[in-house]
């Protein structure tokens, strides 16, 4: 296939469910529009808190079988995000499922020998670069440098992807394919105005017993001017909610309110748009590449128009 036959997008996240929470609507829209959509997940999410009482024995401090269960949940979620025309979202695991383990939320270094944040960074970055060369994506999407609400695996995954994009473009490591330069790199995020508006709208509704409205600062929203790309997912919000429900050990979905909650029971809105931050990519000489990792406190140039699609400017109809 010619590299320009159809658009390809690779989403890279730390745990199962990150993809749906942060960009599920965009993944569904891209798949429906005919793009080849792939997901690279770095861990099985073994340290997640199980909210379903009948499944709590799967937890890490009990039977420690949650990772395998979440593989099936993720497969179901991706099926629900896939196109009605039968397009599938391809699943990849960083060096194979279970190679690295969820590091958990607790502060301090996870002492598990396979903890994601304790792994060999070079080995992990090369594994991610191998997937990039296999998929040959025009667009890569991952966590922001602060990891959203600060999860250490999210922060680590951001660093990993930045390095992997550079490795994939270099004239090295021919054992895992020809070099590939990613055209656009995005971080996930949400603008402050849209986030607070969504919470205000949800707050006008009757919140189910046992839940509370999420606090506005939990998502660590971005200043509006930092957001470069706003994708309309109105037609795909139902698919996103269905995919969220597939992650049943981690998420409770309230379809009638277009909202969900994690183990904290904080009801969180699912807006009809998803936001991203475009990261400048500059590749110089083969042996002297440079990726400009945008300062999270900076903002796009004043003359940069806000995008409405991840494929903007790439020449795809």
From Swiss-Prot:
UniProt catalytic activity: 1D-myo-inositol 2-acetamido-2-deoxy-alpha-D-glucopyranoside + H2O = 1D-myo-inositol 2-amino-2-deoxy-alpha-D-glucopyranoside + acetate
Protein name as annotated: 1D-myo-inositol 2-acetamido-2-deoxy-alpha-D-glucopyranoside deacetylase
Disordered: annotated span: 289-317
Organism for this UniProt entry: Segniliparus rotundus (strain ATCC BAA-972 / CDC 1076 / CIP 108378 / DSM 44985 / JCM 13578)
Functional note: Catalyzes the deacetylation of 1D-myo-inositol 2-acetamido-2-deoxy-alpha-D-glucopyranoside (GlcNAc-Ins) in the mycothiol biosynthesis pathway.
Binding site for Zn(2+): 15, 18, 154
HAMAP family found in the cross-reference section: MshB
The encoding gene: mshB
The UniProt record lists the keyword Hydrolase: yes
Keywords assigned: Hydrolase, Metal-binding, Zinc
SUPFAM superfamilies the record matches: LmbE-like (SSF102588)
